[in-house]
Regions:
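Bacterial Sec-dependent N-terminal signal peptides
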Residues: 1-29
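Beta-propeller blade termini and top-face loops
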Residues: 26-850
Length: 854
């Protein structure tokens, strides 16, 4: 009988897995033809939109202005340069960064991987040629896909589309030094799906046509290239194997390597084979390369080596303390004999809840209530890419143009942490073969050919570096880009100043308070949580000072930091407009008061012996508007506090489809909302496609995703403020390279669903917002813009003719001022008055009434 039950259970699991895989297979990547056609339709419809003249104001911030992925500097006048932002477009300065102009913000792609400029002596910026490769290659959660290559011959006033639509992510554009019609492009390819359009592409007619000259396989593309300027037929290309899904990321593979061409990129040969001195095999990750142009025989390469790091040092072991490893395979008998004082110290050092001490744990293990492995299991994460026992960043040098390689760094370089896939760049001085710059979380410089490195990121800089230009005439002068924007040094990194005039913040979530004037709060990618006045003027978006009497009051910035890390969601208690709930990645939140130092850490944990909780990168939180003492928090379960996030209680079981094996936390709650009409009417959405409703404050939940597309990321659940049973959801296929716009509405608490917005372009949706005053008006933010419906979702129109093309991650309506606040992931915060929208709506509604009465 037991054997029969086991077979039945196994068969059931097999059927469920088959169903799951079949459903997943139905979520197919959107092909380029459909995508480009949709973009053209979008442009056409935007011209006729009733809302085409709606104006917006940008309020910043600028001091933390987003991820810069590439910089191109005029070698004849270094005060002029271009800065390419991951999702904020291309910007141009002629005054060393004091001010910038956006020159790539209305094209069919907003995200940039690399740029190249055909600089000419004595040329004006109106005559030079600029190339833009769209689609960031850093392969993070928000590395959006592009649509190919663009070119401008008039400094960005007009752009010509050059093709490569399935490239998605472009790592490098190399221009021939003397023939402006020849260029090479390193195409990394799709991030979330296999595809053939990867490798190296070459054009000999200025981009009118392309030839794929290096192709490896459907998961391996080219991420980096360099050229011998003395002999332009000699090129190098770095290939990189990487695959990603919503629950897993593999950033290494045996097809990662360096290729060389001796005939202008027409044919290629692998120069990092086994025996070359360069790492090979499944542990090789992202690679960067640099040619020393004064002597092109000298090459440098940086590699993310994921091979295990063997610790051969003779470190003195601290026997006065326990380590995590001590508990890995510990027996019951061994644990019960541990020193209580040392065990208590270990529990304190590792942030175990206060309710656990040595005596209580030993008693629970002795009674078999807990397993001996419970301590180790509680500490070690099942998910996440947290393997620090790898070699990581390594520097290699070749003195024979790639025939052989030698590792030159004598000590481990700790700049990659666990995410070397996010970096992979190396530079060599144009004049000094031994001066090498590379980076990861820090920017590092070597003066001895890569043997030793020194971190030189000082005050006024930001972490996570991605690009650097070295002045060919003065190699102590660098212009570098990182997750916080651009930094400039004139003394090899001893002192830096920060470029702070670009509103390119990458917001995840935003909210407002009810102060007068009201403030806007938001969490930014790798830039923490900030608050700024909704009345911030364009000239005061960054390090411009607030209007104060400077003789009697200290200077203040218009935007202020209220939290670090990757800023996520924010909630404000509008009873005082001072109590703030904010946090960072994977659910580490806090409650703080802006007027004092009162602070409460918020991060619910599982108990010893329980299955670990799972937290989304952007873990959702919610403050009830019915009673702002009530606070909700979503892991894979719902947690609630009745007293301002203190004493959080777990109310639900796992509301997702369950844990899925992989290196990325998955099976997590992504959205929480409460009905504005009924206290305790809650909805949640998950990253694996579940939508659940509770009508009793979170104690009991019902799955209500019948009839919806399966397994899609639920980006937003929004309960209606007009009808109690109405709820709206947006589903997002970005993590399948599917760009469909999915939005659904239910009138019966999710029992049945109806798809709306079927005329929306092929752009993944992030947020839907009801207009609180007019029931028929809906606002939707996508990965490419803002749309509005006047008929409860039957049809939508563009509302972003005066916005740049940029992902819109969040929308908030400040009801007192009747303003729509737009949180973008690349161009900071925009605000518009809704009075004009309402006026247009009423005009349309009155015309329809008149026509009906005739």
């Amino acid at each position: 009988m037991k054997y029969h039950n086991k077979l039945s259970f196994s068969f059931t699991i097999l059927l469920l897995n088959s169903f799951f895989l079949t459903t997943l297979a139905q979520i197919k990547p959107t092909n380029a033809k459909e995508r480009l056609s949709s973009l053209q339709k979008r442009k056409s419809e935007a011209k006729n939109s009733l809302l085409k003249n709606i104006a917006f104001r940008n309020i910043g911030p600028t001091q933390m202005n987003g991820r810069v992925v590439d910089i191109e500097v005029n070698p004849y006048d270094p005060t002029e340069f271009y800065a390419a932002y991951a999702s904020g477009g291309l910007w141009h300065t002629t005054n060393n960064g004091l001010s910038f102009d956006p020159i790539f913000e209305q094209e069919d792609a907003f995200t940039i991987g690399d740029i190249a400029v055909n600089w000419k002596p004595n040329s004006t910026n109106q005559s030079r040629i600029i190339w833009v490769g769209t689609g960031e290659v850093n392969s993070s959660r928000s590395s959006y896909s592009g649509t190919g290559v663009f070119k401008s011959v008039d400094n960005g006033k007009n752009w010509e589309y050059l093709g490569l639509p399935e490239s998605h992510h472009i790592g490098e554009i190399i221009l021939h030094p003397t023939n402006e019609n020849i260029a090479w492009v390193a195409v990394l390819g799709h991030l979330y799906s296999p595809n053939k359009e990867r490798g190296v592409y070459k054009t000999i007619n200025g981009g009118k046509s392309w030839t794929q000259t290096l192709a490896i396989d459907q998961n391996t593309g080219a991420v980096e290239m360099d050229i011998n300027l003395q002999n332009p037929d000699e090129l190098y290309a770095c290939t990189w194997y990487r695959t990603r899904s919503a629950w897993d990321f593999t950033p290494t593979g045996k097809t990662s390597g360096i290729y060389k061409s001796a005939d202008g990129g027409n044919h290629w040969q692998l120069i990092t084979e086994k025996g070359s001195g360069f790492p090979t095999g499944d542990s090789v990750g992202r690679i960067g390369i640099a040619v020393f142009q004064k002597n092109p025989q000298i090459l440098y390469a940086v590699v993310d080596n994921n091979s295990s790091l063997r610790d051969t040092s003779t470190k003195k072991i601290d026997t006065t303390k326990y380590t995590t490893a001590d508990f890995k395979n510990i027996s019951k008998e061994e644990l019960l004999t541990l020193n209580n004082a040392k065990l208590d110290s270990f529990l304190t050092d590792n942030d175990f809840p206060n309710k656990y001490n040595s005596k209580k744990i030993k008693a629970s293990i002795e009674s078999n209530e807990l397993k001996p492995s419970s301590i180790y299991d509680w500490l070690v994460a099942e998910d996440g890419f947290q393997n620090n026992g790898i070699k990581g960043c390594e520097i290699y040098r070749s003195d024979d143009a790639g025939k052989s390689w030698k590792k030159v760094n004598t000590k481990p370089i700790r700049v990659f942490s666990s995410y070397g896939y996010y970096f992979g760049k190396i530079y060599v001085s144009p004049t000094d073969e031994n001066k090498v710059i590379s980076f990861g979380t820090s920017i590092i410089v070597s003066k001895d050919g890569g043997k030793t490195f020194t971190a030189v990121d000082k005050d006024n800089t930001h972490g996570d570096w991605h690009s650097c230009w070295i002045n060919p005439n003065k190699d102590s002068h660098w212009i570098a880009g990182n997750d916080g924007g651009c930094n400039i040094t004139y003394d090899n990194g001893k002192k830096w100043f920060k470029v702070t005039s670009v509103p390119a913040g990458q917001f995840y979530g935003i909210t407002t308070d009810n102060a007068k004037p009201y403030n806007v709060y938001g969490g930014l990618q790798d830039n923490g949580t900030w608050v700024g006045s909704s009345q911030t003027a364009s000239e005061n978006m960054g390090f411009s000072f607030a209007k104060k009497n400077k003789e009697t009051e200290p200077e203040e910035f218009e935007w202020k930091s209220i939290g670090g890390g990757d800023g996520m969601q924010v909630q404000v208690d509008t009873r005082d407009n001072k109590t703030i709930y904010s946090g960072s990645q994977f659910g580490f939140y806090s409650r703080k008061n802006l007027d004092n130092d009162k602070y409460l850490s918020i991060h619910p944990m599982h108990d010893l012996g329980e299955t670990k909780l799972r937290y989304n990168w952007q873990t959702p939180i919610l403050l009830s508007r019915h009673n702002q003492d009530v606070f909700y928090y979503g892991s894979n379960k719902i947690h609630r506090s009745l007293n301002k996030a203190e004493n959080l209680q777990t109310l639900s079981d796992d509301l997702t489809k369950g844990k899925k094996t992989g290196t990325v936390p998955y099976g997590t709650i992504t959205s929480i909302c409460e009905s504005p009409l009924k206290f305790g009417l809650l909805y949640i959405g998950t990253d694996d496609g579940n939508i659940q409703v509770s009508k009793d404050g979170g104690y009991n939940w019902t799955l209500v995703n019948k009839g919806l597309p399966e397994n899609l990321w639920v980006s937003k659940v929004a309960a209606s403020s007009h009808k109690e049973g109405r709820v709206l959801v947006t589903l997002n296929g970005y993590r399948y390279d599917n760009f469909s716009a999915w939005i659904y509405m239910s009138e019966d608490y999710g029992t049945t669903w109806k798809q709306i917005g079927t005329d929306l372009p092929l752009e993944p949706l992030n947020v839907v917002k009801e207009d609180p005053l007019i029931e028929n008006i809906l606002y939707v933010g996508s990965d490419n813009g803002l749309y509005t419906s006047f008929d409860l979702g039957k049809s939508f129109m563009n509302m972003d003719n005066h916005l740049p093309r940029v992902p819109i991650h969040d929308l908030v309506i400040q009801q007192r001022e009747n303003e729509l606040v737009v949180g973008t992931h690349g161009r900071s915060i925009f605000i518009t008055k809704l009075d004009a929208v309402h006026k247009i709506y009423n005009s349309v509604a009155n015309k329809e009434k008149t026509n009906l009465s005739k």
